[in-house]
A protein has these predicted regions:
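Iron-sulfur-associated redox domains of electron-transfer enzymes in respiratory
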Residues: 1-154
Length: 154
C-alpha cells in the first residue's frame, strides 16, 4: 500500500447513497480515502464483505444505512448493526482495533450527516496505527487474513 488511508463505505441505495449523491451534487468534498460501494440495503452486507475489504487493503470499513426503524427493506439495518458488532468483536479477538469497523445511519435528506460520518470515520482511521498486513513482523500481522480464514474463506 502507498501509505494512503483506504476506507470502504458500504452505502444503502435508499438513504446513505442518496445522501452521498446529494452532497456530491452540492460539491461537498469527501476525504479522498473513502471509496463508496452501493448496496441495495445494508442488510445485504455480511461479515465476510467487511473482513474481505480489510484483508484486501482497506484500513477501515463503514456501513451507512437508513435510520433505525426506517429501513426500506424492513429490518435490514438492524441486521447490519448486529453484523458490524460481530465483526468488531472478531477484530478485537485477533488484536485489531474494533474502531476500524463502524455503522452509521441517516436519511436520504441528510447529506450533512453523511459527510460528517465519512469525515468522522476518516479522522478515526487517521488516528490509528497502520493495520498490520501479512508480511509485516508485528504480532498482529495478518490478523485480518486470519479472521477471514477462520470463517472458511480462501
Amino acid at each position: 500500500m502507498s501509505g494512503e488511508r483506504r476506507i470502504v463505505a458500504f452505502c444503502c441505495r435508499e438513504c446513505a447513497y442518496a445522501a452521498a449523491d446529494t452532497s456530491a451534487n452540492a460539491r461537498t468534498a469527501l476525504p479522498p480515502s473513502v471509496r463508496l460501494v452501493l448496496v441495495p440495503c445494508t442488510g445485504r452486507v455480511g461479515p465476510l464483505h467487511l473482513l474481505r475489504a480489510l484483508a484486501d487493503g482497506a484500513d477501515g470499513v463503514m456501513v451507512a444505512g437508513c435510520l433505525l426503524g426506517q429501513c426500506h427493506y424492513r429490518e435490514g439495518n438492524f441486521n447490519a448493526v448486529d453484523r458490524v458488532a460481530f465483526v468488531r468483536r472478531l477484530l478485537e479477538s485477533v488484536g485489531v482495533e474494533p474502531e476500524r469497523c463502524r455503522m452509521f445511519t441517516m436519511s436520504a435528506g441528510e447529506p450533512p450527516r453523511f459527510v460528517a460520518a465519512v469525515r468522522e470515520m476518516d479522522r478515526v482511521i487517521a488516528a490509528l496505527p497502520p493495520l498490520p498486513r501479512s508480511g509485516d513482523t508485528a504480532p498482529a500481522a495478518g490478523a485480518t487474513d486470519a479472521a477471514v480464514a477462520g470463517m472458511g474463506v480462501a
